[in-house]
């Protein structure tokens, strides 16, 4: 059926390497965040026709731009540019006080609400944030899913990304405020916050904000899409909430 060739057809679209970050940095005081520009999305995954909002903080306040890319093979470039939004007015948004069980739950003002176009194929999408004053950059990551049957289901490990996310400073599922690595209960994490630096060994990793997708999962997606495998993408949240689908 025509659906079987969706990934192969998608990867015939012009590719680009502009999805890569050119300049980023980690605040030495926190060791985990890029306060010049950082953000998160209202949803971890979304379907075509549904809306997703982006929440961005720029410190100091300045304008910024959002460029969204679908990640795949694309003639070896790794991504396809889906659109640009901006310049948008940014502002410094507050770091929340720790909630119950050390939960970091940001309640930032949204900067952009986007309706996912009908022709955006299921996949992993990176929203590249570029702050105009310092040219600092970071990512917001989200998944576009669909309900079609495919030969392969690519499940992103976003629950794991979030479990190890220490944004803004030592607030992962394995931090209790006292031990370097904590293995007990009484700690919660959530998706209403940016992804901080985790296990990248560089001081300014060019994957800031993408969870652990670029580190561990993108190579498989790149390879599978290069061979035109029929696949669809989901989040850990999908298999947790809707295993029957």
Predicted features and spans:
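Proline/serine/threonine-rich low-complexity linkers at boundaries of modular beta-sandwich domains
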Residues: 1-36
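Residue-identity detector for threonine
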Residues: 5, 16, 24, 44, ...
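Generic detector of short, locally flexible boundary/turn motifs and exposed helical patches
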Residues: 18-20, 29-33, 89-93, 219-223
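Aromatic-Pro/Gly-enriched surface loop or interdomain linker
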Residues: 61, 67-71, 75-86, 134-245
């Amino acid at each position: 059926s025509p659906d079987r060739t969706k990934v192969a057809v998608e990867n015939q679209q012009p590719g680009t390497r502009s999805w890569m970050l050119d300049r980023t940095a980690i605040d030495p005081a926190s060791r985990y965040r890029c306060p010049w520009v950082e953000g998160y999305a209202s949803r971890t995954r979304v379907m075509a026709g549904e809306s997703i909002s982006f929440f961005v903080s720029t410190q100091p306040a300045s304008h910024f731009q959002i460029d969204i890319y679908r990640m795949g093979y694309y003639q070896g470039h790794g991504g396809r540019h889906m659109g640009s939004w901006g310049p948008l007015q940014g502002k410094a948004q507050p770091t929340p006080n720790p909630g119950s069980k050390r939960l970091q739950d940001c309640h930032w003002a949204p900067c952009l609400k986007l309706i996912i176009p009908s022709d955006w194929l299921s996949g992993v999408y990176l929203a590249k944030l570029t702050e105009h004053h310092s040219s600092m950059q970071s990512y917001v990551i989200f998944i576009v899913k669909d309900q079609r049957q495919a030969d392969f289901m690519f499940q992103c490990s976003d629950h794991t990304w979030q479990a190890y996310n220490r944004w803004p400073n030592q607030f992962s599922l394995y931090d209790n405020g006292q031990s370097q690595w904590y293995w007990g209960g009484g700690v919660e994490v959530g998706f209403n916050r940016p992804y901080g630096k985790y296990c990248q060994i560089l001081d300014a990793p060019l994957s800031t904000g993408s969870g652990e997708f670029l580190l561990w999962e993108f190579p498989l997606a790149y390879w599978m899409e290069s061979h035109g495998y029929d696949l669809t993408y989901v989040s850990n949240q999908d298999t947790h909430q809707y295993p029957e689908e």
